[in-house]
A protein has these predicted regions:
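Positions in alpha-helical segments
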Residues: 28-31, 42-43, 77-78, 94, ...
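Amphipathic alpha-helical coiled-coil/heptad-repeat segments
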Residues: 82-126
């Protein structure tokens, strides 16, 4: 649980995630890393799935065919960056989660308004 999983050959497509489901068995094409206790898992997920990080880590890609270019686990782990204090990671990740939940709620409301609009337009032109 909270492990990071990525596909070395598909990192360019953002194939990286945090396991939020519990004990699972992943395909052998995925590499799995355990997150250090000094890093908040949700923050690490946000960091690793960010397009800026993926762009920077792709500098380590190796291979001769575009479809087969891959970032090795060793190169992935060699990437160094500074992390904020754990408390700041928690605040940041929780704030982003609340924003995400708000967006989902507003999207659901918008869908309802669009359905209502469609119904009213159909009723007008019977």
């Amino acid at each position: 649980y909270n492990d990071i999983c990525y596909n070395p050959a598909n990192l360019k497509f953002g194939v990286i995630c945090r396991n939020t489901y519990g004990d699972l068995i992943f395909s052998p094409i995925y590499v799995t890393f355990e997150i250090s206790n000094s890093v908040y898992p949700a923050y690490m997920e946000l960091f690793l799935t960010n397009a800026n990080f993926i762009g920077r880590i792709r500098r380590y890609e190796q291979g001769t065919v575009y479809e087969r270019m891959a970032v090795s686990p060793e190169d992935f782990l060699s990437y160094e960056t500074r992390m904020p204090a754990y408390e700041e990671q928690v605040k940041f990740a929780d704030k982003i989660q609340r924003i995400h939940e708000k967006i989902e709620l507003e999207s659901a409301i918008l869908d309802k308004y669009q359905s209502q609009r469609k119904y009213l337009l159909n009723a007008m032109f019977i």
